[in-house]
């Protein structure tokens, strides 16, 4: 995430952009589908505060988006050098700024083990399982909504 202030607006379609949505170019007459899906406020009027909402389309986006999938693969590659339990812990710290509880840790380890086994327990199957798990974490409301 680029935390610098100011500068030109960026296109939402620019996959290399790491700016906050405050810096997105917004066409008032035709709101981008991703912004509309995330219940973006009406662009033609002032909106000092947004109410948190979650829509079914948001969940489908996180499950089917090539962009989200690529971010999950990048995170998987970043965590690949550590043991499975530590991967789950680090994923929670990076995505949610907290440690997983015991149930979340066990669920993450169980999910990745079962997914890898279903894929033939090969190295590629294990890597795919971790990418799937991380993508699922990115679809949680806790990741999507800033508290």
What are these regions, as identified by a protein language model?
Residues 1-99, 137-147:
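An acidic, gly/pro-interrupted, aromatic-rich
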Residues 91, 107-108, 125, 129:
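Amphipathic alpha-helical segments in structured regions that serve as interaction surfaces
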Residues 95, 116-119:
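Short amphipathic alpha-helical interaction patches enriched in hydrophobic/aromatic residues
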Residues 106-117:
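Amphipathic alpha-helical segments that form the core helices of the histone-fold
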Residues 114, 121-124:
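Surface-exposed, polar/charged faces of alpha-helical domains
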Residues 133:
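Globin-like tetrapyrrole-binding proteins
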């Amino acid at each position: 995430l680029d935390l610098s202030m100011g500068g030109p607006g960026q296109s939402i379609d620019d996959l290399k952009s790491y700016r906050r949505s405050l810096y997105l170019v917004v066409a008032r007459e035709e709101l981008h589908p991703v912004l509309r899906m995330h219940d973006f406020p009406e662009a033609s009027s002032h909106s000092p505060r947004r109410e948190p909402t979650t829509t079914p389309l948001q969940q489908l986006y996180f499950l089917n988006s090539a962009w989200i999938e690529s971010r999950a693969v990048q995170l998987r590659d970043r965590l690949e050098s550590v043991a499975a339990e530590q991967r789950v812990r680090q994923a929670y710290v990076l995505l949610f700024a907290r440690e997983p509880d015991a149930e979340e840790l066990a669920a993450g380890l169980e999910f990745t083990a079962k997914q890898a086994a279903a894929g033939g327990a090969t190295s590629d199957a294990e890597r795919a399982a971790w990418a799937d798990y991380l993508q699922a974490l990115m679809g949680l409301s806790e990741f999507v909504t800033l508290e």
